[in-house]
Amino acid sequence: MEPPQETNRPFSTLDNRSGQVQVLSATPLLQRNPYSSPDIMHIKGSEASSVPYALNQGTTALPKNKNQEGTGHRLLNMLRKTLKESDSEELEITQETPNLVPFGDVVGCLGIHIKNCRHFMPKISLQHYANLFIRISINKAVKCTKMCSLLSKNDEKNTVIKFDEVKYFSVQVPRRYDDKRNNILLELIQYDNREKRAFLLGSVQIHLYEVIQKGCFIEEVQVLHGNIFVCRLEVEFMFSYGNFGYGFSHQLKPLQKITEPSMFMNLAPPPERTDPVTKVITPQTVEYPAFLSPDLNVTVGTPAVQSSNQPSVVRLEKLQQQPRERLEKMKKEYRNLNTWIDKANYLESILMPKLEHKDSEETNIDEASENTKSNHPEEELENIVGVDIPLVNEEAETTANELLDNDSEKGLTIPTLNQSDQDNSTADASKNDESTPSPTEVHSLCTISNQETIKAGRIPPLGERQSESMPDRKMKNVFFPLEVKLKDNYPSILKADSSLSEVAFSPKEYNSPSFRPEYIEFKPKFQFQKFNKNGFDPFLRNINKMSVRKRKDQDIYKYRNILGAEVIEHEDQDPPYPAQSKTAGPANTTWAHDPNIFTTKMLETENKLAPDPTINTIKGLDTKNSLKENLPNVSLPSIKGESSRAGNVQANTCHLSKSLNFTPHIEYLKQSMILKSILSENLQDLSDKLFSKPEVSMNSEAREKSSSPLLSIHDKSSSSMEDNVLEKKQDLNNWLSEKDILNSKTTLSQIIKNIPADSFSEGSQIIENIPADSLLEGGQVIKNIPEYSLSEGGQIIKNIPADSFLESGPGQSPEVEEHVSKKHFEADERDFPIKKNSSTKKKHLISEVPNSKSGSSGTVHDYIMRQIFTAPIFSELEIEVKEPSETPMNLENQLPTPWKRSLSSHILFHEENADEIELPQPRSATSQIIQAFPIDTLLESGIIKVIELDKEHHKSSLLGTGITSPKGNLKDSQEYYSEIRSETEPLSEQSIPIIPKDTTSVSRAEFIQEDQNMFPQDSSYYSIANKELYLPRNGQRLCKDKNDLSSTLESLTNSLMDKLSESDEIMLKSFLKNIFNVFFKYNHSERRGQPEKELERLIQPSFTSDTEHLEELQEDFDKADKLDRKPILSPKLRVFLEELSESEVKHLKSELSKQIQHYLVERLSESGHITKEDLPKIYQNLYLMNEKAEQKGPNSFQGKYSETVKEIMSFVNNFNHHFIDKHLEIKLRSFLKEILQNYFLKNISESSLFNETASETIYPNISSLRTKSVSISFHELEQDISKGSFGRRFEINMKYPLSKSLQNYLIALSENELLHLKADLSKHLQSLFIEKLSKSGLMTKKQLEGINQHINLLNSSSIPLKYIKTHLPFRDDCHFVEKHSEKQNKYSRIVQQTTLQTVSEDKLREAELIREKEKKYFPLQNLKGNSSLIKEQKSYYTKEEAKTPSLIKVQPSSNENIQASPLSKSSEILTDILLKKLRKEHVFTQLPQAENSVHKTEIQDPYSWGGKSKITQSKAWCEKTLKMKSLDRKEHVNIYKWTVQEKPEAVLTSYPRIPNARMPREDEYLNRITFPSWQSSTLTHFNTETGEKSKLEDQYCQTLKGNNNNNKKHLVTFAQYKKEIQTLYIKPDEICSEKCAKFPEIQSFQYKVVEDEKNLKPHLFPELFKIEDLKPKVRKERDRVAQPKKSFNKIVRILPTTLPTTRIHLKKSVPRTLLHWTARRTIHDCSDKFEDLHDMTSFTHLKKVKSRSRLLGKSSDDIHNHARHSARPYTAPEVNKQRESYSGKFTSRRMVSSGLVHINDKTSDYEMHKMRPKKIKRGY
C-alpha cells in the first residue's frame, strides 16, 4: 500500500518536520534507529529537537546541541548543506545506489502525537479527570502515555487534558484493507488510585490506510464508550515508509523520493563523516555502554580499524548511566533461558506485553490497597535498603512520565523492579550485616518487602509502591508500565536474588496471605518465566505482563478487602519479602517468630500452594524476616519465644486464614492452575540449573525445584549419629511434653477451626521454615541459598538451618535445640504441629550434627519429615510425634492438596537443604545428583536400600513404599516405616523422607546432603563397600526413579486431587513429571559420565582384581538387594521390580553398577583416599575395566557380533539406497530393528546383560551365550515377531541391538552364521509381514493361504529361484530387485547378486533361455495347474471381482508363494528374484531381437507384478504361443509373467496391496486384453483389497519416478520388479499409472519405448514382447524399436491389431482402470490420477472405471489412443487374436487399471497396446 506522494509532502517541508522532529527526538525510536550512529542519535535527539527551530530561528538553537561533536558552525554547515543540496544531486546519489531488493512486508514508521482531550461529556464526574492516559494499540504493539489530570476542573466544558506525547510504531502495512492489523486503537483510560485498577472510559479506532493516504495530518476524533460520547481527542498522525520513518522501504522505488519526505529531518552529514560513495553519514564510535555487560564484548558501533583522522570516542550521558538493578536481573533471567524460543518469548513479553484490561485493573486495585497499607513500611524499608528504594522512588518521580512512556514502549518498569529488588538486596544485606537488625528496622524491612512482594505479584503494585513513595500522580504514571514489568521483572529479580528474591516475593504474598501466596507462587517459581509464559495482556501494555499476577493480585486484593484491615495490617507488618529474601537468615528467623502470620500465609498459600508450594515458603520467609527483625539475635530460647510468638501470630493468621477461606476456592484453583503451568516451566529450568550446578545448595534447590516434596533427610554420617537421631527422636517426643502437645493441639485445633485447611498447610510449612530460620540465627544461610531453595521457603529454611546449625549448632546444646525445636514444634503445631516439629527437629539435628548431630532430633525430624512428606503420613506423624493428630489430620486433609505435599516436603526439604548446605560434603556431581534424587525413589529403586545400611535401606524402602501406596497405605506404611526408621534411626533418617514422591525426591536429596556429613550420597553413609552398594542402588534408583516418581506423582496427585481440579492435577502431574524427568536425566547423565570409570579405577587400585572385585561387589549387592528387597522394598516397589523384564532388570543393574562405581570414586576422592590427580587415572582404569570386561568373555563374541552388527548396518544402509518407498523403509527398518533387538536381547539376557553392565567381565559369557542362542533366539524372535508380540521388553531394550556387544557379536558372526541369520530374518519377515497383513485385514484368509503356499514353494524352490534371480541383472529392474531382495534377505540377495554379477550377459541369456523354457513349462505347468482357475477367471469375468480373488489365490498358489516370500520380505525377494530371473531369461532370450527384448520387458513389468497374472492367463495363451513358434518363447514368457503377475496380485491383495494395485494394472492390461475376466477379476480384487496398497504403490511409483526420472525404462522394469518384489511398495500402482499415462501418448510412448528398449530392452520388452507374440512383425518392430520410432510405430500398429480381441475382455475389466487413465492422458496426470484413483476405494473406482471405460471404450479410448491408434486396432484382426493372448499378457493389471485396455473394444485393445509402451515408458 504505497501512499500517494502527498503523504510525503508534509514531511518534506521543514516546518512540518520541525514540530514532529521535536517530539521524535525524545523518542526511543530514534535511538533504536539502526542507521543512526551515536552521533546521529545525538543529532536527532538533542539536535533534532533543536533543528526544527534552528531552521526557523537560525543558529539560536545550535548551542543546545551539547552532545554534538562539532560547534554551532558545524551544525549550520550541515543544515545549509541539507537545505541547499539540489534535487539533482540527490538524484545522482540515489542513482548511484543500487535499487533495494523487495523483501518481506511493506513497513513504515507511524508516529502518533497525542495532543489533548477536551469537550468531555458533562455527565462524566470530575473524579474521572484524574490519572488519565491514552493507550495506543496497533496490532500487538501497545504503548501508553503518561498519566495526566484535567487542567481545569471548574469549567467542565473547557476542561482540557494535555498529553502532548508522541509514540512511534514500526508497523507492517498489511496488503488487505480489512486486515485487523490495520486498526489503530486509541483508548482513554483512567487509573483509580483507591481501587488500584484502570477503567476504560472510551476508545476510538482509526484505519492505518487512512493515515498512510493522508501522510501527516491532525485530526480530532471522538472518543466513545460504546455509543456514548466521552470527549474529543486531538491526535496528529504521521506515517513514513521504512522501519524508522526515513522513507526507506524495500518495496518503494526511487530512493531519492523516499528519503525526501522522511518523517525525521534530513541533515547533511559533516564532511569529516560523509561517506564519499553513498554521501551518507558514517557511523561514529561510541563508548562502551555502561548498561552492557562487559563480558558481552559488544563490537557494534566500534570501528573495525581505528583511523588516525577518526574523532575520539563519543561519550553519551545516557550510555554512561549505570544500569538499573532490574536490568541485571533481567540479564540473568535471559541468560538462564535455555532455548532461543524462550529467550524470544522473554524479550517479547517485556517489549510487547499482552493486553489484559481486567487483570491489570484488578491488580492495580489490589496493589493500591497494598501500597497504601505498606507505604510507611515501604519507606522504612527504602531507608533501610538505602539507595535502592530511594533510587526507585526518585526515578519514579523524575522519570515517572518519561519512564512510563519509555517503559511502556520499552517495558521499563525497571525502577519499580529495582526498588523491590534493591530493597530486597539491601534489606538482606542490612539484615545479614546486622545479623540481628533492630526489630523496628527488621519490621520495616519486612513490611516493605511484603508490600513489594505484593506489588511484584501484581506488577502494578510495584508501581504503586513507587508511586506511594512518590506522589500518586507519579505512581499512576509509572504504575501501569511498572506493573507490567514488575511482574515480569520482579520474578527475574527474585531469581537474580535467588532465595532472597524468592523470599521477597513470598512476603508480598504474605502481605495478603491468600492473595499474595497466589501471585507469589507464580513469582517464586516463575519469577522470570512467569511473565515470559504469562504474557497476559495487562490492562496497559506494561500491565500486560501483570496478567497472572494481576489476577492473583486482584483476587488477593479482593480477598484482602474481605479479610479486612486486620489482615491488611498484618500483611503490612510483615517485613518486605524482597528484603527478607536478601536477609534470608533473618527472614527465616522472622518466620519462626511469627508462626501465626506464617499460618495465615500458609493458609492462603495452601490454597495457592497446591499450585505453588514455594509461595508458602516465601511467605514463611517473610514472616521469618519480620520475626528476625523482632528477634535480631535468634537464639534457641529466642526462637522458642518466637515460636510462641508465632503461635500468637497464628492467631492472627487464623483470622487471615478465615478471611482467606472466604476467598473462593475457585480463585485458588485458577491461580493454582496458572501457578502449575508457570511452575512446571520454572521448575524445569530450575532443575536443569540445579542439576547443572554441582553445588550442594544448587542440588538442594534442584531438589526443591524438581520436587518440593524432596524431603530428603540427611543421614548422619555415622551410625552413632543415627542413634543420636533416634535418641533425638525420642527426646523430641519427650520434648513434646503432654502440655506442649496439648497446647499445640489446642492451638492447632483453634487454628484449624479458624484457618482454612489450605492456610493450615501453608502455615505448617511456614512454621517449619521459621524454626529452621530461628535455629539459623544468622539467616545468612538463606542468602547463600540459591533462589531455588528460596523457591520453596522451606527449602531456603533448609539451607539456612544447616548454616545456622553449623554456625550456632556447635555452641547450642542439644537440649537447647531440643527445647527450641520443641517450642517451634509447638508453634508449628499450631499451624501444622508435625511440620513445625519436623522442621525444628531437622534443624536441631543439623545443629546437633555439628555438635555430633544427636540422632534423636534428627530422627524426629526425619520421622516428622517422613510423615509430613506422606500427605496422609503427615497426620500419622502428628499422631506419632504429636498428640494433636486430629489437627494434623485436618491439616493433612487440607494438605493432601499439592500444597500439603509440596508444603511439607518443602519445609522438610528446606530444612534438610540447610543441613545439606551445612554438610555439603557431596561436591561431586554424582553425589549431588544422588542427593538430588528423592530418597524414597532411591529406596524404592533399591539403590539406597541395598547400598545403604540394611536398616536404612529397609526404612527407605518402607518409606518409599508408603509414598507409593495410597494415602491410607502411605500413612500406615509410613508409620510403620517411621517406626522402623526410629529403630534404624541413622538409616531411617536418611530414608525418612518418604513423603509423596515429590517429597520423596526432596527427602532423597536431603538425605544425600545429610549423608554428605558422612558421604555425599546415601551410600556415602556406609563404608566404601556400602558406597559400592549404594552406587548400584543409585543405578536402580535412576532406573526406578521414574517409576517412583510416577508413583509419587500419583500419590501427590491423589492428595492434590481433593482440592485441585482435573486440569490442575494434570498440570501438576506434568509439572512434576517434567521436573523429575529433567532431574533424573541430569542425574543419569552425570552419574553415567565418569562415575563408573572412577569407581572402576578406584576399585582397580583398591582391589587386586578390580573387575572381579566389582563383579563380586555387584553380586553381593545383588544378593543384598534380593535379601533386602523383600523387607526393604515397598509392596509397590516389589510389584514394580517383579514386573520388570529381565532386560529391564539388567538395565537397572548395569545402571546401578555404573552409578556405584561413579559413587565410589567420588566418595573415595571426597574422603581423601583418592586425590584429584588420581581421579582421571581411575576413570580411565574403570573405562578400561569396563572395556576389558566386555572384551574378556566376549572377545570372539564381540567380533562376531560386531560383524553381524556391521552386516546389519550395511544392510540397513543398503535399504536406504534401495528403498525408494520411505514408508516401506521405515516399516522394514523398525521390523528389522525389532527382530534384531528381540534376538539380541534374548541372547543378551541369556548372557546376563545385567552382570555384563555391572561387571563388564560378563561380556565373555554374554558373547558365548549370544553366539549359542543366536539361532534359537532368532527363531524365537521370529515367532514373537510373527506373533506381533515384541513386548515392552523389546522396546525397552531397543538400544541393545546397537550396543557394542551386539555389534561385536554381529561382526564376529561367520558368513554362514550371518547367512543363516539373514535367512531366518527373511523368513521371519515374510511370516511377520503376512501375519501383520492378515491381522490388519489387508489379506483375506484365502490370500493368506495362497501366500503361505507360495512361501512354502519359495522356501522349497528358493534356491533355484534365487539362482535364476542372481542371473537376472535386469539392469535397473533386476538390480533394484536384487537390492531389494538384499534388503529383505541380505544373504540371499547378496548371493543372488553376486551370481548375477558373475554370470556374463551371454551366459545369462543362455541361462535365461533355458530358464525361459523351464519357466515356460513351469509357468505352463502352473497355468495347467491353475488353468482351470484361469479359465474360471475368464468365465468368471463377469464376476471379475469375486473370481479374481479366487484366481489370484489359486494362481498365487505356485507363483504367489514366490510373492509371499517377498511379502515376508525374504520370500518376496525370492519371488522377485525368480521373476527377475524369468524376466531376464525371457528378456535375454528376446533381447537379441528388439521385439523379443521389448516383449520380454513388457512381460517383466506384468511379470514382476502382473507377470503372475500373465502366466495364469497364459494357459490359453501358452497354447496360442506354442502355435506361434516365433512368439512361442515370448508367449511363454508372457504367460509366465502373467502368472507371476497374478501371484504378486494375490500376494499384493494378501499383503502388499500396493504391489497388487500395480499388478492389477499390468495384469489388467493383459487380462483385459486376453483374459479380461481373469484380469478384471484380478484387478477388481486388487482394487477392493489393495486399494490402500495401490495408493501406496502409486506414491511409491511417484517416488521412483522422481528418483529415476532419468531412467524411465529402468523405472518401468524396476517399478514392475519392485512391485512384484515389494508387495508393500507403492511403485506397482505408480508404474501402472505411468503406463496408463503413457498410453494416451502413444507416439511419445513409442519413442520412449524404443529408447527404453534400447536402454532396457527387458523392461520395455514385456509389452513389445506381447506385441511380438501378436505378430512376428512385432519382433521386427521391436528390433526397430531398438532403432527407435519406426519400429515403435510398427509395434504400435501391431499392438492395435492385437488389442481388439483383448479389448472385449478388457471392457469388463478395463472400465475401472479406464476411468482412471481416461481422465489422465499425460503420463504425469495419468500416474497421479491413477494413484489418486487407487487411493480411493479401488473397488468403487474400478466399477466407475468400468462404466467409463465402456463408455470411453469407444470414444475415450480413442481419445487416449488418438484416431490412428483406434483405427489400427480394427485393422489387424489376426493380430487381434494374437493380441488376445499377448494383449492379455499385455493388458496387465497395470494396463487394465490404467484403463488403456478398455478404451474401446477394438480400439481400446489397440490403444492399450500403444498405451502400454507408453506405460512402460511412463513406468520407467
UniProtKB/Swiss-Prot annotation:
It comes from the Eukaryota. Residues 87-222 form the C2 domain. GO terms for biological process: flagellated sperm motility; sperm capacitation; spermatogenesis; vesicle-mediated transport to the plasma membrane. Residues 415-443 have a biased composition (Polar residues). Pfam families: CTSRT (PF15729). Expressed in testis (at protein level). It is found in: Cell projection, Cilium, Flagellum membrane. Its main location: membrane. Changing K123M: In a colorectal cancer sample; somatic mutation. The keyword Membrane applies. Transmembrane segments: none annotated. GO terms for cellular component: CatSper complex; sperm principal piece. Keywords: Cell membrane, Cell projection, Cilium, Flagellum, Membrane. Residues 360-383, 403-443, 695-722, 838-857 are annotated as: Disordered. Component of the CatSper complex or CatSpermasome composed of the core pore-forming members CATSPER1, CATSPER2, CATSPER3 and CATSPER4 as well as auxiliary members CATSPERB, CATSPERG, CATSPERD, CATSPERE, CATSPERZ, C2CD6/CATSPERT, TMEM249, TMEM262 and EFCAB9. HSPA1 may be an additional auxiliary complex member. The core complex members CATSPER1, CATSPER2, CATSPER3 and CATSPER4 form a heterotetrameric channel. PANTHER family: CATION CHANNEL SPERM-ASSOCIATED TARGETING SUBUNIT TAU (PTHR21665:SF2). Auxiliary component of the CatSper complex, a complex involved in sperm cell hyperactivation. Sperm cell hyperactivation is needed for sperm motility which is essential late in the preparation of sperm for fertilization. Required for CatSper complex targeting and trafficking into the quadrilinear nanodomains. Targets the preassembled CatSper complexes to elongating flagella, where it links the channel-carrying vesicles and motor proteins. It is linked to Spermatogenic failure 68: An autosomal recessive male infertility disorder characterized by globozoospermia. Affected individuals have a normal sperm count, but spermatozoa are round-headed and lack the acrosome. In addition to pure globozoospermia, some patients have a mixture of acrosomeless spermatozoa and spermatozoa with small or detached acrosomes, which is defined as acrosomal hypoplasia. This is Cation channel sperm-associated targeting subunit tau. It comes from Homo sapiens.
